[in-house]
């Protein structure tokens, strides 16, 4: 009975507790939305990246328009026809320079707009691009515009907050030195002829072919045909007054040996309608000596061979534009102009 009474009392207490009112639960605080993550700032490109961007922008836009030129491959055969095109060549040279400036300026401004690292830009265009070089390029190259664009150099530097862009248009060596010897020599002959005979306005020059040479340099030269008569025919009319004579002639019997005046490298062995069979040697000081009208093409030497002063390079002949056996000697200076060989040989032969 006692156990039953205890169970009843416990049940009554639990029921009473269940009937008691409960206090309302405190409301949960409202949950704030999570803040969006702050995006990381876009990193500024470094100086090298900016310079690369500027160069890429230049080359993407630089495309000089040479659609008005005709590939002629005239060489030295039709100089009057080439000179008639001088205004076109001068215009192409000026346009190319202007286009280079415009493309460099635009590329620099584009880079400036993309970076707070740059406040100012500076553009410089340099190069020896004139109508004579353009004439050689248009005459000897199928696509001179693409060649000029490909050999244009662009350097970009950053000094402080200034972007400096320097565009260097190609000179003769950049355009032609890497090419095959026939193209290189043809272009050089033409370019040097134009430099020697015409000014910037294609007016004929009164050029006596003088060039200052030191006694030390003269000592490196020998007379190729001692005791033979040397004719000073520099700058005389040739080919019915369509061109000037770029050298001096030395009379000699056919098959007489021709030694090299200087030590140097054989850069050209070939034939053309004016020079006939010829050999050209570039000496150790950058002068080119061409020996023309040889009786036959020299086969015992090859282009690229080294020859020493006095070494046999061929034999006197009467080939090409010649009416009697003789050696035509021409000399091209490192500045790409022909010089008169007569006073050079006179100093070698007579010491004055």
Identify the residue ranges that each predicted region occupies.
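Surface-exposed, glycine-biased beta-strand/turn segments
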Residues: 189-277, 309
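Residue-level recognition of beta-strand microenvironments
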Residues: 233, 269-270, 294, 316-319
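Zn2+-dependent peptidoglycan hydrolase active-site motif and core
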Residues: 245-246, 260-300, 325-330
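Glycine-centered tight beta-turn/hairpin loop motif at sheet-sheet or coil-to-beta transitions
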Residues: 160, 284-286, 336
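Non-catalytic extracellular/periplasmic "stalk"
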Residues: 21-225
């Amino acid at each position: 009975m006692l156990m039953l009474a205890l169970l009843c009392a416990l049940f009554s207490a639990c029921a009473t507790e269940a009937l008691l009112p409960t206090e309302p639960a405190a409301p949960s605080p409202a949950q704030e939305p999570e803040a969006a993550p702050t995006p990381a700032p876009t990193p500024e490109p470094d100086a090298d990246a900016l310079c690369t961007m500027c160069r890429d922008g230049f080359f993407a836009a630089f495309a000089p328009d040479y659609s008005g030129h005709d590939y002629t491959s005239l060489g030295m055969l039709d100089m009057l026809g080439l000179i008639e095109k001088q205004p076109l060549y001068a215009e192409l040279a000026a346009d190319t320079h202007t286009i280079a400036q415009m493309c460099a300026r635009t590329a620099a401004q584009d880079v400036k707009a993309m970076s707070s690292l740059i406040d100012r830009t500076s553009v410089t265009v340099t190069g020896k691009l004139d109508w004579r070089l353009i004439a050689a390029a248009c005459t000897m190259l199928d696509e001179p515009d693409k060649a000029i664009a490909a050999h244009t150099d662009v350097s970009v530097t950053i000094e402080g907050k200034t972007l400096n862009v320097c565009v260097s248009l190609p000179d003769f060596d950049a355009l032609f030195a890497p090419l095959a010897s026939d193209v290189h020599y043809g272009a050089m002959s033409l370019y040097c002829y134009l430099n020697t005979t015409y000014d910037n306005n294609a007016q004929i020059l009164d050029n006596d072919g003088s060039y200052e040479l030191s006694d030390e340099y003269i000592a490196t030269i020998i007379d190729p045909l001692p005791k033979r008569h040397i004719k000073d025919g520099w700058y005389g009319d040739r080919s019915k007054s369509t061109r000037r004579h770029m050298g001096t002639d030395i009379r000699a019997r056919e098959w007489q040996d021709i030694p090299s005046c200087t030590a140097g490298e054989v850069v050209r062995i070939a034939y053309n309608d004016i020079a006939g069979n010829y050999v050209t040697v570039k000496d150790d000081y950058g002068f080119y000596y061409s020996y023309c009208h040889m009786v036959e093409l020299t086969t015992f030497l090859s282009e690229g061979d080294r020859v020493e002063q006095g070494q046999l390079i061929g034999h006197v002949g009467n080939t090409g534009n010649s009416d009697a056996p003789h050696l035509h000697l021409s000399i091209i200076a490192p500045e790409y102009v022909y010089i008169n060989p007569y006073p050079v040989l006179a100093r070698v032969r007579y010491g004055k």
